[in-house]
A protein has these predicted regions:
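Surface-exposed loop/turn motifs in large extracellular/passenger domains
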Residues: 1-2
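Short HxH-centered metal-ligating active-site micro-motif
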Residues: 8
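Glycine-rich hexapeptide-repeat left-handed beta-helix
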Residues: 11-12, 19-21, 25-135
């Protein structure tokens, strides 16, 4: 993940493997997924989702509780009938997990993604904790 200068990230926002250029505002509860790019001065409002591999242009405002997908960018409301096809085009499973399972085979795709994540976490099983933080 890359964060530019003067970026504000609100409480409970999630940023995963994305690029956030300078002077962006990521509001409370917003989510920015892997491979997404927020251009300089972009705003992602409360509860909005910027999907994988999406490019949000500089100074663009992603409205609250919407889903931004693609390059060029399109913004969808949660109930939009075109949203599933837009999400499929974002290639989230491939970008986030390296999984290339067919979109229609949802169970296998989710299982494959969970296996990848479990292996990533498992690779840290023997890590040494350098600082456990304050005593509780």
């Amino acid at each position: 993940m890359l964060l530019g200068d003067h970026v504000f990230v609100g409480p409970h926002a999630t940023l995963l493997g994305c690029t956030v250029e300078a002077a962006c505002y990521v509001a409370t509860g917003a989510t920015i997924l892997q491979g997404a790019i927020l251009g300089t001065g972009a705003v992602v409002a409360v509860g909005a989702l910027v999907h994988a591999n999406t490019v949000v242009p500089s100074e663009y405002f992603v409205p609250p509780n919407t889903i931004a997908v693609g390059d060029p960018l399109r913004v969808y409301s949660p109930g939009n009938e075109q949203l599933p096809d837009a999400i499929r085009s974002a290639s989230f499973a491939r970008t986030a997990f390296g999984v290339r399972t067919a979109w229609e085979d949802r169970v296998t795709r989710y299982r494959d993604g969970a296996e990848v994540r479990a292996q990533e976490f498992g690779s840290h099983l023997e890590d040494d904790i350098l600082d456990a933080g304050p005593e509780r």
